[in-house]
Amino acid sequence: MIWRWESATRWYEAELISDLFGDWLVVRRWGGLYSERYGTKTDVVPDLFSGVALLFEIDQERQRRNPPYTLRNKSL
């Protein structure tokens, strides 16, 4: 499950995945649309539902940014 947000100059992605050990991870990536600079952060979540809840929290945070990010892609 990958969600992607964009502003005029920046992008942000959050991906919910299961690793080889069965752990659920939320991988966040961000960077500039016109640069090669980026960052990443991985959080381990207890289960699928906690991961989905974290995606919705991230969506709320992206909406509160000034200027706000727009959800461009939501794949399940």
Model-derived regions, located:
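Short aromatic-glycine-(Arg/Gly/Cys) micro-motifs in beta-strand/loop hairpins
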Residues: E15-T42, F56, R65-P68, R72-K74
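Short, charged/polar surface micro-motifs in flexible loops or helix N-caps
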Residues: A8-R10, L20-F21
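Negatively charged, low-complexity tracts enriched in Asp/Glu with abundant Ser/Thr
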Residues: M1-A8, L76
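Short amphipathic alpha-helices within nucleic acid-binding modules
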Residues: D47-L55
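Conserved helix-adjacent loop modules within structured domains
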Residues: L48, R62-R64
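Short N-terminal leader segment in a subset of presequences, especially plant chloroplast
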Residues: T9-E13, F49
